[in-house]
C-alpha cells in the first residue's frame, strides 16, 4: 500500500472517529440528488414530462424528459420534449442541443423542426430558421405555416 493510500485511510478514520463530517447525522444516509423513481420507464418519465408541460411547469418537465433520455438515449420524442421545456425557460443553447439530438435520431420529425426553427427565431438566427423551414415545408404544411409566421414576426 502506498504512502498516499495510507494517508487517505488515516484521514477517513479520523473523520469517523470524530463523529463524521461536522454537523452530519451519521445515522441517516446522505441525501442524494433526485433520480428516476424505482421501476420507472422512459415512457413513464416522458408522460410525466408531458403532464408537467401541460401544467406549464417547464422545470419539472425538463427534469422528467432528462430522466426519459437517460433511460433511453434514442428517444427522439423525449429529446424534443426536453428542447421545448428548455426553450420555454429561455435556455436556448441547451434547447438547440436537445432539438438537434431529436433530429439526429429522427431527421424528418416535423414538431422538432418547427420548434428548432422557433428557437432560431428567438436567437435572431433568421437564416437558420429559414433553412429549417425549407426542411419542414414538405413534411407538415400546418407546422411550416406556424414557423413561417414566427419568422415573419421575428424580422
Please provide the spans of the model-predicted regions:
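Position-specific recognition of the canonical hydrophobic site in helix A of tetratricopeptide repeat
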Residues: 53, 80, 84-87, 104, ...
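Structural marker of alpha-solenoid helical repeat scaffolds
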Residues: 71, 105, 138-139
